[in-house]
Amino acid sequence: MAASENDVQTYTDTDFAMDTVVSETLYTTGDDINSKLTAVLTDVETNLLSWTNEKSQIYKVNADSGKDTEISDELSGYLKRLLKIAEDSDGAFDPTIGKLIRLWDIGGENQKIPEEAEIKNVLKDSGYQKIFLDGNTVHMEEGCSLDLGAAGKGIGCDRILKELETKKDVIAALMNLGGSSVMTYGSKPDGSSWNVAVTDPRAENEDDYLGVVALNGTEFLSTSGDYEKYFIENAVRYHHIMDPSTGYPAESGVTGVTVVCDSGLEADALSTACFVLGVEKGTQLLKAYGADGLFVDEDHHVYLTEGMKERFSLLADSYSVEDIAE
């Protein structure tokens, strides 16, 4: 028998993990409502994804570049799926550009515009074709550097889903990782949709939103934008989403991309790939994965895939919704 609304307690918490503010809302029928789900995210970061922590599997893979490295079933599964997205996006998403990301260090203490020679040098050590996966054995060509940061929060959300599925008293949940990665679990007690705000890429105030996306049941949302980490030099915006083919911040004409699908990893990786690809090519990639998406361009136009048209409500008056060219 389903629990009535009167039987359900609501638990909210705000914490910090994966270098961002994490807010959670749980609907539970049990007494122990303190789930500490952020501990799951910290474990993913520390033991799986970090490229600076020696405990991390990614750290070990990078340290052993040029050699075979044994990895867990979990990481092997993630890598297999990410390499497929890299291939399907023609390298617009590429998990091997770790050196390039650290060269620019956008959002870090040493952010800069690198010399052309520096960029060419690190690009020689990147390329998803340089990593080979055979079961639980991974081999990267020497000098290659793995960085799963573009899918990290999504992977964290996938792990949280597994954790929530073990908690019988939790009937629904919302996890928001800094606004860029959101997951919903189950249905709200009142049966309404989960409404998630999408940032206006050129908002003057943090509370100015582009619009709202409705999520239903268990779904994952990821947003990639040129406003998250960037600096401006000589009137040029240098943001953190790199085009692996050029070694420079992507210039596809879009300022933000939001993707909704049934996997955190895919939502994260696809939003990055679509930002690099732009509206038309990005839309085709989303179709291949059965994902919904919205694209925002530099001229304040919003482009919605067919599935996103049923989810999205525009709030910002300075934007207009346009059709995607076939």
Where are these regions (language model features)?
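Mature catalytic core of soluble alpha/beta enzymes
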Residues: M1-E326
